[in-house]
Amino acid sequence: MWIPSKLTRPGRLHNAIVRPRVLELLQQAPYYKLVLFRSPAGYGKTTMAAQWLADKTNVGWYSIDDSDNDGFRFINYLLQALNKATNGNCNNAQKLAEKRQFSSLRSLFSDVFAEMVDFHQECYVVLDDYHVINNEEVHEAMRFFLKHMPDNLTLVVTSRANPPLGTANLRVRDLMIEIGNEMLAFDTEETTRFFNQRVADGIDEDTANNLRNYVEGWPSALQLIALQAQHQKRTLAQSAESVSQFNHAHLWDYLVEEVFDLLDADTRKFLMQVSVLDHFNDELVYALTQREDALGMIESLNRYGLFIYPLEGEQNWFRFHNLFGEFLSHERQARIPQQEQELNRNAAIAWLKQKSPHQAIRHAQKAYDGELVAEILNEFGWKMFNQGELSTLESAINLLEKDLLFSNPKLTMLRAWLAQSQHRYNQVGTLLAEAENEHKKRNIDLDIQYQGQANALLAQVAINSNDPEKALELAELALSQLDSTVYRSRIVATSVVGEVNHVIGRLDRALPMMQQTEKLARQYQVYHQALWAILQQSEILIAQGYVQAAFELQDSAFRLIEEQQLQHVPLHEFLLRVRAQVLWCWNRLDEAEECAYKGLQILENHAPSKHLHSYSMLARIAIGRGELDRAGKFIEHIQHLMKQSTYHVDWTANASLSLILYWQAKGKLNAIQEWLDTAVRPENACNHFCQLQWRNIARAHINLGQYDQARQALNFLQSEAEKANLVTDRNRNLIIEAIFAVHQKDENQAKVLLKEALQLTNQTGMVGNFLIDGATIGTLLEKLTNRHELGDLERHRALQLMKDISSNQRSRSVHFDEEFVEKLVTHPNVPELVRTSPLTQREWQVLGLIYSGFSNEQIAQELDVAGTTIKTHIRNLYQKLNIANRKEAVTTAENLLQLMGY
C-alpha cells in the first residue's frame, strides 16, 4: 500500500553546485528544532536540503503530495521516515499506525518519543512539500511533535508557504533556522559557477549578473536558460535577451517556447502521458504507455535534465520536478484532452498491478470511470477496510452513481459497515433499508448470506441502542443464516447474543457465548472483537462473584493489547475502567487512580462526554481519601457532562454514586432530594448497572430518612439479585441493608447483615463498599469481633476493615478541610497563636500533607501547583505558628488533632 519513492531522498546531485553560504548557516542545525526551507516553486528547496543532508547517515525523507492530507496516510509515512532516521527505533509506533490503533496523533507521538528515549544520535526527518497539507489535524499534531520531540532530532521542512507549525514562536525563541527564497536564490558568484558547469563557453561576470537580475536568482529559470543555450546553440548573452521580460505568469509559455517545442514529438507525447502520474517507476510507465523502452526513456530524459528526479532505492522510482510536472499537466490537458480519461484509466490499472488500490481509485475517479471504481472497491474494499482506509473508501462509495452502487450488494454492505465502524449507528438501519429497496428495484436477489450480514449488523446497532430483545432476535436469526466462512458477521452476532444474555441477567448463558466469541475472534485475527469479548467475560465473572478470576482475565486482555498494539483504541479505556472499579472495591486506591488517569489519556482526542466514567472514579477515590475539596472539582466536571449529554444507565449510575457519596459527605440533603426526584428507575435490576442505580436510590432514601421507600428499594434489589445470581451485588446490597438497619436502630439485624456480607466478601474481596460507610458500621464491626461472633476469615477481614476505616478517618482529618479548620479555630482550648495568626485554607492543607509524610514535591503534585509556591506556603505557616522545621510541623499538627479528639 505504501509508495517507496515517497520515502526516498533525491539522488544524483553531482550536477548541483555546492553552496557554501547556505551550508555554513546549516552547520548549527543540530541545535535547532526546525530547519525551514520556504520559497516559491522552483527555488531549489528540495535540492538544497538533499545536498546538505547527503553525507548525514540518520536521515528520513518523506515526499508529500495532496493525498497525504488523510491523517492516517500522513502519520504512516511520517513514522516510516522517522523509523529510518532512528535506525528502527520506532517500530512499535509504526505498527500501531499501520493498524490504525491509536486514539489521536498526539498520543501516538507520545509513544514515539518514549521509544526514542534510548536513541541519542543526531538525526533528521525531512517533510518535503509540506505546503500541500491543508488538514488542521495534521498541523496540530505536527505542532505537538515539534514541541515535544527529543533534542537529538531536527525536523526539516520544505514548503512554498509559511507552514502553520508555530514558526513565529520558534523564531522568537531562536529554535528555527529559516532558509527563504532570498537565501535560496542564486547570487552572482553562484550563478557564474552554475553556468560554467553547464555551458562549454563559460560566462563572464557581467552576463551572469544580468541573468541573475533578470530572474532574481530563480534557479529553475536559470536552468531553463542553460537548456536554451545548450540546445539552440545560443550564447548566454542571447539567452539573457530572450528572458528579459520573463515572470512567473509567463512560465508555461516560456517552457513551451524554450524547452518543450525543442523536443521531438515522441518525447513530448511520452512526457505528457507520464505526467498523469505523481510518482512512477518503469513498471508503472510501461503499464501506462505500453512502451517496452520505458526505463531507457526515463533515464535518457533524466540525463537530458528535464526535471525528472531519480530517487534512492532499488525500484528505479522517479518523479518530476513539481514545476515541470505542473507544466506537463497543463500541456497534456491543452494538447491531448481527448486522452485524459484513457490515461487516468490506464494509470488506475497500472497502480492496481502495483497493489495500490488507493492510488488506483484516485485515477479511476479522475477518469470519471465509476465502473472501474466499483470494480476496485469490490476487489479491494474489504482489504482497505481492514487496513483502516475508511475515509478513502467512504469518499469513493459516496461518489458512485446510484445504479453502480446499488448494483453491487457487496458495496452497499461495505457502506453500512463503514457507518457502524465510525459510530454512526443511527444511519445503519436507514442505509440497509435503502439498499434493500434499491436492489429490489433492480431485480437483484439478496442471498441469505447478505441477509445474515445485515441482521448481524442491525443486531449490533440494536444492543448499542439499548434494545436487547430486538438485538437477540436479530443476532440469532443472523447465526441461522450465515455460513461459517462469513466469519466477521458470525463473530459479531455471537458477541451480541452473549451481551444480550449479560444484560438480561442470564449470566450462565452469557459467559460461554463470550468465550466462543473470543475464540472465533482470535482464530480469525479480529482482535478488537476478541478484546471486547474478554471485557464482557470479566464483567460477567465479577457479577457472579468470581472477582479474582475476572482480575486475572483482565491481565490476559492487557497482554492482548500489548501483543496487537491496541493501546490507543477506546476499548483499552474500557479495560482500565473495569480494572479501576475492581481496584477501588479492593481499596487499592492509588492503582485505581492510575487506571482512571490512563483512561483519560487514551480518550483525550475523543468527545469530552466519553470522560464521564474516569471523572466518576476519580471523584470516588478523592471522597474515599477524605479529599473533599479535590472531589468537588471532579463533581463539577461530572455534573457539567451529565447536563451536556445523554448517557446509558451504566454510565449515569456510576456517576450518580459519586455524586451521592459527595453530597452525603458534605451533608447536602437538598442535592440528594433533587437527584432522587429525577432519577431513572429501571423496570428490573437483573444486571450490575441497574443494581447500582437502585442502590443509589436506596442510599438516597436512607440519607433523606425516607425509610419506607428505602425498604421497598432494598427488597426489590435483593429479589432481583437472587433471581439473576448476582453474587457481588448481593454482597454490596447487604452492606446497604446493614446501614439501613442502623438508621432504624436495629443493631442486631445490622450485625446479622454485616456478618453475612463479610462471609460473601471472602469470595468477592469487596471492601471498598464497607469503607465508604465506615463511620456508620465501624462500631458494629468492633462489636462483632469482640464478641467472637465471626469465623476466623470473617474476623480477620473485619479487623482489617476497622484498621482501614480508622486510617481513612485519620486521612480525612489530616487534610484539614474547611469544616475541620472552622471547628479548630473556634475551639476554646486552641493555642492563642493559632487564633491570632490564622493560616489560609491552602496553608492548612499544606500542614496536613506535611503531617501525612508528603515531601514538598509530592505536596506540589497533590495540590497541582508549582514547587516554589509550596515553599512559600511552608515558609508562611512556619512563621505564623512559630515553627522551625518539618519535625516541629508534624508535632504541631499532631497536637491540634489530639485537641480535636482524633
UniProtKB/Swiss-Prot annotation:
UniProt xrefs under Pfam families: GerE, TPR_MalT
Alphabetized UniProt keyword annotations: Activator, ATP-binding, Carbohydrate metabolism, DNA-binding, Nucleotide-binding, Transcription, Transcription regulation
Free-text activity regulation comment from the record: Activated by ATP and maltotriose, which are both required for DNA binding.
UniProt binding sites for ATP: 39-46
A GO biological process held by the record: positive regulation of DNA-templated transcription
Domain HTH luxR-type positions: 832-897
DNA-binding region: 856-875
Domain of life: Bacteria
Molecular function as annotated in GO: ATP binding; DNA binding; DNA-binding transcription factor activity
SMART domains assigned: HTH_LUXR
Gene3D superfamilies: P-loop containing nucleotide triphosphate hydrolases (3.40.50.300), Tetratricopeptide repeat domain (1.25.40.10), Winged helix-like DNA-binding domain superfamily/Winged helix DNA-binding domain (1.10.10.10)
InterPro entries: P-loop_NTPase (IPR027417), Sig_transdc_resp-reg_C-effctor (IPR016032), TPR-like_helical_dom_sf (IPR011990), TPR_MalT (IPR041617), Tscrpt_reg_HTH_MalT (IPR023768), Tscrpt_reg_LuxR_C (IPR000792), WH-like_DNA-bd_sf (IPR036388)
Function: Positively regulates the transcription of the maltose regulon whose gene products are responsible for uptake and catabolism of malto-oligosaccharides. Specifically binds to the promoter region of its target genes, recognizing a short DNA motif called the MalT box.
Subunit structure, as described in the record: Monomer in solution. Oligomerizes to an active state in the presence of the positive effectors ATP and maltotriose.
Family designation: Belongs to the MalT family.
Name of the protein in question: HTH-type transcriptional regulator MalT
Protein source organism: Vibrio vulnificus (strain CMCP6)
